[in-house]
Design a protein with these regions (language model features):
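Extreme N-terminal starter segment of soluble prokaryotic enzymes
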Residues: 1-4
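Short acidic, Gly/Ser-rich segments with clustered Asp/Glu that frequently serve as metal-coordination loops
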Residues: 8-18
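Metal-dependent phosphoesterase core characteristic of DEDDh/y 3'-5' exonuclease domains
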Residues: 21-28, 32-63, 85-160
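Metal-dependent phosphoesterase signature
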Residues: 60-83
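Preference for bulky hydrophobic residues occupying beta-strand positions
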Residues: 6-8, 45
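Alpha-helix initiation/capping motif
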Residues: 19, 70-73, 138
């Protein structure tokens, strides 16, 4: 059994086709853990945007991704999701909250016209799981990743 923790970066772009804003995925990042929770592989891929042509300044600042990088190194969403599907295999997909899952479904639907992710058979929202484990059931206040890590004694200081 493997566990794949997914983290997406996206840019808010207005779709003239849908007449609404879309969280267009610009990067897919993931870490694969084995059944003993050891890191066994990583995945990162830039996705060339097709809906929006330029990154908003907040996204550039947060991600450190540039428009030039996306143009030069980004692949199509369909190619990126195909490679990610291969990486995921039969593993359990995990995200912190369900916002990445919603963005993934939204983008998949935009590019394929289908709302069901064919490669997704097992999923876990780690935020909900941790809130249950810590007996935190206040619907007005979601548990943040940093707070959860602190409660679990995880040190985020970077190695030099």
């Amino acid at each position: 059994m493997s566990y794949v923790i997914l983290d997406l970066e996206w840019n808010g772009s207005y779709s003239k086709v849908l007449h609404k804003f879309v969280n267009e995925i610009i990067e897919i990042g993931a870490v694969k853990l084995d059944d003993e929770l050891n890191v066994c592989d990583t995945f990162t891929m830039l996705v060339a945007p097709k809906i929006g042509k330029k990154l908003c300044s907040k996204v550039k600042q947060l991600t450190k991704i540039t428009n030039e990088e996306l143009k030069d190194e980004g692949v199509s969403f369909i190619r990126a999701i195909s490679l990610f599907s291969d990486f995921l295999g039969d593993g359990v997909l995990m995200t912190w909250s369900d916002s990445d899952l919603h963005a993934l479904i939204e983008n998949y639907s935009y590019y394929t016209g289908r709302t069901r992710l064919p490669f997704l058979s097992r999923y876990c929202n780690l935020q909900s799981y941790c809130e249950d484990c810590l007996d935190l059931h206040d619907s007005s206040c979601q548990l943040g990743l940093g707070a959860c890590a602190e409660m679990a004694g995880v040190d985020f200081s970077e190695d030099d």
